[in-house]
């Protein structure tokens, strides 16, 4: 018989014994409630059967408890054995970590790595095109700022200060020649002189009045 079948049979017998003990106990109590004398054979038979079922139930319960405790202890031992096996396998797989000289080798490796990191930082600092001082005030140097100002001055439009102006007229702008701030602006165009009136007889003062002269010719 397998282990599972044996456990099932034990549980079934325990359940049957428990049911039988309850039936005989109920019969005994019923007879007692009905006033049957304890000397009555019916009461004696029911009581003895209930007592026997009760004792059997107690014995089976204790047996089941002992078996259960043994099973629990065996489980604890099994767990401990499995734990030890797992620890042994783990240490075997990592036995190189158990070397007493491993700590010294780790310290030496850390020192080598630190030295290599410092060498890398020095190489990066030497290869950098921009030093920390050049970037302290921004990426533009003072010379770059001066160059930008010069570009702005040469590209700005220039105002003619010698051109005649009239009320409401717009100022005349012209870019500087050849892009140089010191170049002279083109001179303004010359104005043609007004023509003089043609010579002729003197104007008659009376002609301006609009009246014809009454005097005949020769007077």
Curated annotation (Swiss-Prot):
Region described as Disordered: 159-219
Keywords annotated in UniProt: Host cytoplasm, Host nucleus, Phosphoprotein, Virion, Virion tegument
PTM comment, free text: Phosphorylated.
GO cellular component, as recorded: host cell cytoplasm; host cell nucleus; viral tegument
One Pfam family per UniProt: Herpes_UL14
Record bears the keyword Nucleotide-binding: no
InterPro entries for this protein: Herpes_UL14 (IPR005207)
Record's compositionally biased regions (Pro residues): 186-202
Locations listed in the record: Virion tegument; Host cytoplasm; Host nucleus
Family statement drawn from the similarity comment of this UniProt entry: Belongs to the alphaherpesvirinae HHV-1 UL14 protein family.
Reported function: Contributes to the nuclear transport of the viral transcriptional activator VP16 during the early phase of infection. Therefore, participates indirectly in the regulation of the immediate-early gene expression. Additionally, seems to be important for efficient nuclear targeting of capsids.
Name of the molecule in the record: Tegument protein UL14
Source species taxonomy: Viruses, Duplodnaviria, Heunggongvirae, Peploviricota, Herviviricetes
